[in-house]
Amino acid sequence: MRLPLLLLIWGVFALAMWIPAVHAVLVNDHQTSQSFFYAGVVGLVLVTFIGLSVANRVPRYGMPGQLMTLLATFVFLPLYLAIPLQDALRNTSYLNAYFDMVSALTTTGADIFDTPGRLPQSVHLWRALVAWLGGLFMWIAASAVLAPLSLGGFEVTTRAEPGRSDAILHESHRPDPRRKLILVTTALAPVYASLTLALWVLLVLCGEGALVAICHAMSIMATSGLSPIGGIDAAQAGIAGEMVMFLFLLFGLSRLTFSSDTVAVGHSRLDQDPEFRIGILIIFGVPVLLFLRHWLAALEVNATDDLSMALASFWGALFTITSFLTTNGFESAYWLSAQEWSGLETPGMILLGLAVMGGGVATTAGGVKLLRVYALYLNGLREMERLVLPSSVSGEGRGNRRLQSNGAFVAWIFFMLFALSLTMISIALSAFGVPFEEAMILAVAGLSTTGPLIEAAGQVPIDLTLMAAPAKLILCFAMVLGRLETLAIIALLSPNLWRS
C-alpha cells in the first residue's frame, strides 16, 4: 500500500498521542489521558479511511510533491495536534493551542504559556515530543527532499540551480523519492533516538528527574528550547547536566557529527568540515571576548579577582552562546551572574546575531546556516585578495572555488531574501499593534526558529498572550517560513520545478 507522505506523518503523530495518554494514566491525570487517547484514536481512524481511498493512487509529482508535503505538514498538521492540547488545558483558546503546536513542530520553542506550572506534566511531555518528532522530520527531509532539490543550504555547494536537482542532468540516475525517503529514515531515526536516549540517561545520572530529563533531552536534540520547568537554570542536574547538554548541542553545528549522507564538497572528515570549524571558532571566540570584557570591567571598578566567579562567567557565556548559535535557546544558570559581574546588561544583540547566523546545514538548527556564512567569508577574502593583487589566481580547490563564486552568489541572494522577510514580518506585526522593538525580536525569533529569544533578547520578556490574533498568525507564518526557508517557498511557486 502506497500511502501519501502526509498521511504517514499524520499517522505517526496520532500514534505518538498515546505516549502522553499513558503517562497521564500513570500520574492519575485521567482527564488529560482521555484527551490524548481519543484524539489519537480519531486520527488513526481518519488516516485509515483516507488511506484506503487513495491507497492505489500513483503520485503525479516526485520531489516537488514531497516539498509541498513539508509545507502542508507545518501548516495543517498543527490544526490536528492542537485539539488534544486545548481539550487537556480547557482554559486556553484554540488559536493559542495552534500557535503552540506550530512553535513546537517547527522546533522554534516560542512559549505562549508563560507559567510552566499551569500545564499538566503530560502536556509538557507532549509539547517536547512534538518538537522532537519535528526535529527528526527535518533531519530526514534535509537529506531525502531538500538535498536532491538543492535547497536548505545545499544550493551553496551543488552544481544545480536552487529548486532543481543534479539528477536532472542525468535522467538515468534520477533517484526514486519514496525509496530514498525510506532509506534515509531507516538510517537516521535509530541514530536520533539513540542519541536522545543516551542524553536522557546521562541527565538522570546527573540528578535530574525523569520527566524533566526526557523533555530536556528531546529539546536539545530538536533544538526547540522547550522546558517543563521554564529553563535549565532551575534544573537539578546543575553544571554537570549543562556540560552533558553542551556536548550534544554540538550536533547542531554540522551534519557530519552524525551522518555523512549529504557530503557535497569533499569534506568528509569532521575536522575539515568548514561548518564545524567556523562553529567552534564562534563558540569559543565570542565567550573569550566576553570574558576579557568581564575581566577588564572588574579591574575598572577595582573588584577583587575571584577565579571561581570568572570560571562561572566563562562557562555561562560558553553554554549560552552555543545554545543560541544552534538555535536552541537554553540559558545557562550562570548566564545571569555573568551579566551582573561584567556589567553586560543588554546581551540581546549578541544573542540575536548568533540566532540569525544559525547552525549547520541539514541539522535541526535554524538561522541562515554556517555554510552560507562560510561561503560569503571565502568570497570576501577572495575579493580583498583581488583588490591587492588584481592578476592573482585563486589557489583554492575546486570545491572552494565553487563556494567563492556561484555558492557565494546564492548565499547572498538568500541573505537578501532573509532580510526582506525580516522587514515584511516586522512591518506586519507592527501594523497589528506590536511595538517596533518587540516586532523585530519576534521576527528574528520566528525566522531563526529560536523562540527563547522572545524572553532573552529584550529588556523585558514579551507576553505573547497579549498579542492580537492576526499578529499570532503572522508569527506562525514566520516560524514556518524560517523552518522551510524562503528559497523552498519560492521553489514551490516555480513552474519549472513542477514541469521537471
Residue ranges of model-derived segments:
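Membrane-proximal intracellular helices of multi-pass ion channels
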Residues: M1-S500
